[in-house]
Amino acid sequence: MNSYLRKLVEGQHLTEEEMYEAGLLLLSDNILESEVAAFLVLLKAKGETAEEIYGLVRALREKALPFSNHIKGAMDNCGTGGDGAQTFNISTTSAFVLAGAGVKVAKHGNRAVSSKTGSADLLEELGVNISCTPGEIDYLLENVGIAFLFAPAMHPALRRIMKIRKELNVPTIFNLIGPLTNPVNLETQFVGIYKRDMLLPVAEVLQKLGRKQALVVNGSGFLDEASLQGENHVVVLKDNEIVEMSIDPEKYGFSRVKNEEIRGGNSKENAKITLGVLSGEKSVYRDTVLLNAGLALFANGRAETIEEGITLATHSIDSGKALAKLNLLIAASHEKLERVN
């Protein structure tokens, strides 16, 4: 590890293979917590490259719990966090809208790290059992159409690093790579990131991971979601080509809303917001979810255009299908599920 730390101190980039090897060291018991903290801080200060991100993702996926089945059409819409905006759980709420529109959603997430309420905190508050095995997750994806993958359970080697991340209390490469380490073999992905200069590198990593289609967004105000506040910067991966574009919410019929107006709170407060959106209540929360779910449906290929994606998302909510998916997941996640090993 010392050789890698020296390179980072000197501002040098690591190769993909060096980062892969460093990642395996980070996940081992043969490294001091001080070395882990130093590595994460130095890497953040230098700035992460696509090769470094992919190298670490390779190490994490290698050490993750194995999934035996390929779930056709599986998608994730996990964001990085780390934007400091304290918004409600936009991507988790949107996940049920996607499922209601017929997408199989493998929602990868965690408890709060730099926010008040993480996806795991919200889902527990709503009554979802987040402690599912890979076999149970496969079952839920096939039979319910949505499942939650609790990151610490999927990545047991990360437990010590999670403690160090919490103590550091600053965004690190692990915020960036969280959405990229989903152990399910995803076909498509919608990723929100808090660092605009990482749009292309993250898209390049998704390409290396073999995603058929993907969309990476950095929202107005550097939100790790699409925002109604103003212009959103987007990179689209389709047909193995990467294209940059911008998304103005007003073009799709939404009024501009400041990010401060979609702040969330604790898990109880955020659960109330999510239930309100899924129940069809008109609000700025609903409009934010419609924009994000619409973009995700476009990224998935379920919709040919963003406009069509927003229309499908609206129908998912107003037909009651999105809320039905939540209720079905709550019930099914507590049943004794068939385990596919």
Curated annotation (Swiss-Prot):
Its GO biological process terms? L-tryptophan biosynthetic process
UniProt cross-references to NCBIfam families, sorted A to Z: trpD
Cofactor(s), names only, from the UniProt record? Mg(2+)
Catalysis performed (reactions): N-(5-phospho-beta-D-ribosyl)anthranilate + diphosphate = 5-phospho-alpha-D-ribose 1-diphosphate + anthranilate
Tell me which residues bind Mg(2+) 1: S91, E225
Source species, domain of life: Bacteria
Q: Which residues bind Mg(2+) 2?
A: D224, E225
Positions with a binding annotation for anthranilate 1: G79, N110
Write the Enzyme Commission number(s) for this entry: 2.4.2.18
Q: What is this protein called?
A: Anthranilate phosphoribosyltransferase
Which function does this protein serve? Answer: Catalyzes the transfer of the phosphoribosyl group of 5-phosphorylribose-1-pyrophosphate (PRPP) to anthranilate to yield N-(5'-phosphoribosyl)-anthranilate (PRA).
